[in-house]
């Protein structure tokens, strides 16, 4: 989007996630094998899951020549967590009561309650460590510690990089130069990789996978993970403030049809919550929600609603989002619910439509842990709660359980808690989650990658520039 910014607190699409991962690093990272490991932190420790100590790597330099110290970490986190912050990561850090430097290479973070999964949180792509001066960071700076130095950035257009000769990671960042181009048009993206104008594309339209697979110079790279496509209803906006209406819409969707016609089988059914089978505490025991016209009509009549309901859609959300919205409208029509699909422009979609209009199409990369996913988009104090589900009795109960689960070390008890949170979201929340999608890329065979490719984000967890190389 032309509103994109180098302020990592505003990152909201794969173009910016990849840009940040290319010029910056985080305290922790998710490896290509899906495992959590230290990045700018060399090690971490906690005796009670409430006080966390991160020991920093020594000798790491920012692109401006400044040596990384604990002050940079403190200033970065303070930027994202201060009361006036508009950072999407602010909700992730509300549990942090204090963060302080203990010498130049040690950071101590105090939480208001134990959270065994906190090291995952500090790997969030928004929490990119930037250099500080007088206790502050320049949020608009493109200076980081990553494998590539940002050369040029045109919002919504392109970003170019040169290899960082002083990169601290061994065996990483193999390209001399990297250029990322924002191609929102699916056909343009496909043509670019087929013609050799680009070496790789992400978010391949499932409809073109078979075509691209026949191109002898290309490899189709497909990874199942936590990526899911959603249609968030803002529960504080009419008519979605009515639970019966929300349930009517949830029961009006032919999910298998969406998986078959939109994903062409490159994914699986969703059950109106964001936790996938790749997550440790997926609630497999919840009944799969199906197209149920009788139940949908019962709820619709109980809602008292009549007239047209608008669903804003754009393929900026995901390939085939407009078609998916049309299928939802068609199945709802069988029930007797009138849905008008509003085609929204791709440019500015994330700024003007998502998290603003009452009902729209969306995608979420998902997160490796339940708490991280909830902290990003479902708890009551995150900016990215795109359903605004915060104050219903079930939402209050959900938030309470999430806080309890963070401190619960008994695995069976945590599982029970997280299963209950998934039920609460599915039955009361505003998220329609009809399907989980595989990450699909088309990559030139002149580009090589490791045996493992991360599924936490597209493009090898956003770190393709660091992890891939010329074949």
Task: Give a label for each model feature.
Residues 1-48, 78, 143-145:
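N-terminal lobe/hinge region of extracytoplasmic solute-binding protein
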Residues 65, 330-383, 417:
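Periplasmic binding protein-like
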Residues 31-35, 115, 122-173, 177-179:
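Gly/Pro-rich hinge or "lid" segments in bacterial periplasmic/extracellular proteins
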Residues 269-302, 316-322:
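Structural transition elements
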Residues 441-471:
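Long beta-strand-rich cores associated with HINT superfamily self-processing modules
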Residues 45, 55, 89-131, 152:
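Surface-exposed binding/hinge segments that line
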Residues 136, 166-211, 338:
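Ligand-site clamp/hinge motif
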Residues 338-348, 375-445, 471:
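Extracytoplasmic/peripheral linker and loop segments enriched in polar/acidic and small residues
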């Amino acid at each position: 989007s032309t509103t994109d910014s180098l302020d990592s607190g505003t990152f909201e699409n794969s173009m910016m996630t990849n840009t940040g991962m290319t010029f910056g690093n985080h305290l922790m990272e998710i490896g290509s094998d899906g495992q959590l490991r230290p990045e700018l932190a060399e090690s971490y420790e906690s005796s009670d899951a409430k006080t966390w100590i991160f020991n920093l790597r020594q000798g790491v330099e920012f692109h401006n020549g400044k040596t990384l110290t604990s002050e940079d970490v403190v200033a970065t986190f303070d930027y994202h967590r201060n009361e006036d912050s508009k950072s999407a990561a602010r909700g992730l850090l509300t549990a942090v009561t204090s963060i302080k430097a203990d010498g130049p290479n040690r950071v101590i973070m105090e939480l208001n309650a134990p959270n065994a999964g906190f090291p995952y949180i500090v790997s969030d792509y928004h929490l990119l460590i930037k250099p500080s001066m007088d206790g502050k960071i320049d949020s608009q700076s493109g200076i980081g510690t990553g494998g590539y130095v940002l050369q040029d950035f045109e919002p919504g257009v392109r970003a170019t990089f040169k290899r960082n000769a002083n990169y601290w990671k061994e065996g990483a960042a193999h390209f001399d130069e990297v250029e990322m181009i924002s191609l929102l048009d699916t056909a343009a993206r496909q043509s670019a990789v087929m013609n050799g104008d680009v070496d790789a594309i992400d978010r391949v339209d499932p409809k073109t996978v078979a075509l691209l697979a026949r191109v002898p110079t290309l490899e189709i790279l497909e990874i199942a993970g936590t990526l899911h496509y959603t249609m968030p209803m803002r529960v504080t906006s009419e008519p979605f403030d009515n639970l019966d209406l929300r349930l009517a819409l949830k029961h009006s969707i032919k999910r298998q049809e969406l998986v078959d016609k939109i994903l062409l089988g490159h994914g699986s059914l969703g059950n109106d919550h964001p936790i996938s089978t790749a997550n440790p505490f997926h609630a497999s025991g919840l009944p799969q929600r199906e197209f149920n016209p009788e139940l949908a009509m019962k709820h619709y009549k109980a809602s008292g609603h009549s007239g047209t309901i608008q669903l804003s859609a754009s393929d900026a959300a995901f390939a085939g989002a407009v078609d998916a919205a049309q299928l939802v409208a068609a199945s709802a029509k069988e029930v007797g619910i009138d849905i008008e699909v509003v085609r929204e422009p791709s440019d500015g979609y994330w700024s003007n439509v998502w998290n603003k209009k009452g009902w729209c199409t969306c995608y979420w990369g998902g997160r490796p842990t339940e708490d991280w996913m909830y902290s990003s988009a479902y708890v009551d104090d995150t900016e990215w709660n795109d359903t605004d589900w915060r104050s219903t009795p079930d939402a209050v109960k959900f938030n309470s359980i999430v806080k309890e689960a963070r401190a619960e070390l008994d695995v069976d008890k945590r599982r029970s808690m997280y299963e209950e949170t998934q039920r609460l979201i599915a039955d009361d929340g505003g998220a329609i989650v009809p399907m989980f999608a595989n990450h699909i890329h088309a990559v030139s065979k002149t580009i090589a990658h490791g045996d493992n490719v991360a599924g936490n984000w597209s493009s090898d967890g956003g770190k393709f520039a660091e992890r891939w190389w010329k074949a």
